[in-house]
Amino acid sequence: MRRVVVTGIGLITPIGIGKEEFWKNNKEGKSGICDMPELEKFGFESKAYGYVKNFKPEQLGLTLREIRRMDRITQFGVLCTDQAVKDSKIDLSKIDKNRVGVNIANAVAGTKFMDEEFSVLTNNGKEVVNPEDISPYAYARSMPNTTSNEVSYRYDFNGTCCTMATGCTTGIDSIGFAYDQIRCGELDVMICGAAEAPITPITIAAFEAIGTLSTNNNPPEKASRPFDDTRNGFVLAEAAGILVLEELGHALNRGAHIYGEIAGYGSVNNAMHMTGLKPDGEDLSRAIKIAIEEANVTPFEIDYINAHGSGTKQNDINETGAYKKVFGELAYKIPMSSTKSMTGHPLGAASAVEAIVCCLALENNFMPPTINYNKKDALCDLDYIPNCGREKNLNVVLTNASGFGGLHAAMILKKYID
């Protein structure tokens, strides 16, 4: 099997646009959570959101025509890809574009456009839809695979073009799919990761209906509290995280900078319940074990874990239980943290952003903190790197995710060693 490495990254998040701003704020434990006065009229109990401020697509490289054509999620994905391709320093004139694929994932696709379009077309639900008034972009802007398509068009990448849609594990699953495509020799380069822009009334209402959103609104910066005893839900957010994956020889031949190596990937389903989780973490533990075995490492070699850490009561207990099943007493000695304490939960994009955190952690030998951790939960009693990040020599790191529908995924990344 061929080896697969990360050579480019792009980030659009509530704590920064671009890797430099993002990593600085991630290291320092800055919260990107805010209130959104324009949503007050809907009367939602949750009033804290991970909104990407100062996002100006026209200044980042999109034309006005492209902005009109693309939903916010696609703008995120395309511009984040621009960052990642530029960061990779890949010479597009010297590669075989038939050997380059795209898989940019999402959980809920173009809800912003559809929400706004429905309101306009029906006078806020008071009138029937007149087909003659519908935008010619309506279907394309709402398709789950539009972002992957737009990136393929933009760069003339002619390999696989597809979209994972596995909820909150979809970022890792997209990277895992890309890893498998390259490892097995189908492609040499993959653009992968995820984008999400779900802060819309319909999406917020859907999550409120099942009681998953945090109501710790005052102040909003402290609403996301993974593993803390006072947590009561996740903070809905938007973001994009895009990676350029390459076959190792392809990367070395062009002298690419290597952030890290994708070494193992595991994905399972508990086949039990749409939102329910077993508190012992048995199902997530299986995904972690698969990733560790595929990476050919031992549990003792894991230096850091970037946790799913959504901030819901049951998820954080389930995740803690999974670590204890996999690592036993060693679980108490492995530092771990939740990026969502700062960014909120951008659904499908979360685990893509968190895989990039692992790359930057490996490169900088630094583990970011879990902020807003002030009161210990007796059932969540591991080392969550509370409130202040730490330096540590990192060689092997783990990231994982869980999602509605009983999905669990895990990935091992290694520092590249020749």
Residue ranges and their predicted role:
Residues 125-135, 176, 180, 196-253, ...:
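Glycine-/small-residue-rich "gating" segment that lines the acyl/pantetheine channel
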Residues 134-139, 159-166, 228-232, 334-345, ...:
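Short pre-catalytic strand/loop immediately N-terminal to key active-site residues, enriched for Gly-Thr
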